[in-house]
Amino acid sequence: MELNTIKPASGAKHAKRRVGRGIGSGLGKTAGRGHKGQKSRAGGYHKVGFEGGQMPLQRRLPKRGFKSLTLKYNAEVTLADLQVLAADEVDVPTLKQAGLVGERAKVVKVIKSGELSKKVVLKGIGATAGAKAAIEAAGGSVA
C-alpha cells in the first residue's frame, strides 16, 4: 500500500445534498422547507427556548440555588484522618503532602467524625466545636 493509493472506504464519503435544483432531485422548488412560514425563509428561525410568545419554561420556573466558586478552595478533614496521620503538628501543607486535601485547598476545617486518641496540635486549621473538644480531650490543641 502506498500513500498515493489510500482512499476512504466505499460509502464513507457523501456528496453534499444540493437542494432547490429541479424536480428530478426530489428537493426542488421549496428545497424541503415546505410552503411559507418563518422556517421556510432565509435567516428565519426562533431563538433557543422561544415558545411562540408564551412565557418560556426557564422563566416560568423559580430561580434556585447557586454553585459556590470558593468551594474548590475549602476542604474538610475528619478526626479519623488525623488519627492515621503520622505528624503531631498538623497544618495545611502537611495535609496536602499526605493527600488528605486537594492541592488547591486554602481553608481546611476538622470535623468530628471518627475517634482520636493521640495528641495532635492544629496550626492554621479550623475545627468544629465537637472536633475541638475531642482534640483537647486527647491532649492536643487548636491554634
From Swiss-Prot:
<comment type="similarity">
    <text>Belongs to the universal ribosomal protein uL15 family.</text>
</comment>
<keyword id="KW-0694">RNA-binding</keyword>
<dbReference type="InterPro" id="IPR005749">
    <property type="entry name" value="Ribosomal_uL15_bac-type"/>
</dbReference>
<dbReference type="InterPro" id="IPR021131">
    <property type="entry name" value="Ribosomal_uL15/eL18"/>
</dbReference>
<keyword id="KW-0699">rRNA-binding</keyword>
<comment type="function">
    <text>Binds to the 23S rRNA.</text>
</comment>
<keyword id="KW-0687">Ribonucleoprotein</keyword>
<protein>
    <recommendedName>
        <fullName>Large ribosomal subunit protein uL15</fullName>
    </recommendedName>
</protein>
<feature type="region of interest" description="Disordered">
    <location>
        <begin position="1"/>
        <end position="51"/>
    </location>
</feature>
<comment type="subunit">
    <text>Part of the 50S ribosomal subunit.</text>
</comment>
<dbReference type="Pfam" id="PF00828">
    <property type="entry name" value="Ribosomal_L27A"/>
</dbReference>
<dbReference type="GO" id="GO:0003735">
    <property type="term" value="F:structural constituent of ribosome"/>
</dbReference>
<feature type="compositionally biased region" description="Gly residues">
    <location>
        <begin position="21"/>
        <end position="31"/>
    </location>
</feature>
<dbReference type="InterPro" id="IPR030878">
    <property type="entry name" value="Ribosomal_uL15"/>
</dbReference>
<dbReference type="GO" id="GO:0019843">
    <property type="term" value="F:rRNA binding"/>
</dbReference>
<dbReference type="GO" id="GO:0022625">
    <property type="term" value="C:cytosolic large ribosomal subunit"/>
</dbReference>
<keyword id="KW-0689">Ribosomal protein</keyword>
<dbReference type="InterPro" id="IPR036227">
    <property type="entry name" value="Ribosomal_uL15/eL18_sf"/>
</dbReference>
<dbReference type="GO" id="GO:0006412">
    <property type="term" value="P:translation"/>
</dbReference>
